[in-house]
Amino acid sequence: LPGRASFFAACDAAEVFTPKPSVKLPVLEEKRVYVTCETGVHNIGSDFFEELLKGALHVLGVPDNYRIDVELVSRATIKEYNAQKRGVDKVTDVLSFPALDYAKPLQPKDKEAARFLLDEFSGLYQLGEILICRSVCVAQAHEYGHSVEREMGYLFVHGVLHLLGFDHVTDEEYRQMRD
């Protein structure tokens, strides 16, 4: 398959902390989660994220008709986005960029705007984009004593919750997000 071998070769050859150009997986069938690898050895595919997305949406009682872009990025890239988008000039583990603004969790401010996010071909709505810093994920997994896969899953679900309007600025918001 064109592009598939080069994707794995680019990711396998990458150093964990060395930025590499983004390479997208070829679209073979309609996916709900599109994964891009910018840096590091990448062995977690879209199926991993799709199962987590389905589970999170099920728990929240949200229909499973969303699509998300996930990019595994370098420390430099996530720091740059954090500074540009949030005004925080430091490295972080995960950033989320929702396609809609929310009044409160699961309630978009402009419900009509959602119709513009529908891909008529697939029937899926674009929920937004999640950036995960792979090297921070690896460091946190070691720090917390669990697998990189578990930490990656936690960061992804955390990002999905942000895409759906959840936040953790106040203690109550934090509790709601954790529940």
Model-derived regions: residue spans:
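An acidic/histidine-cluster motif and surrounding catalytic segment
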Residues: 1-153, 164-179
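Periplasmic solute-binding protein
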Residues: 161
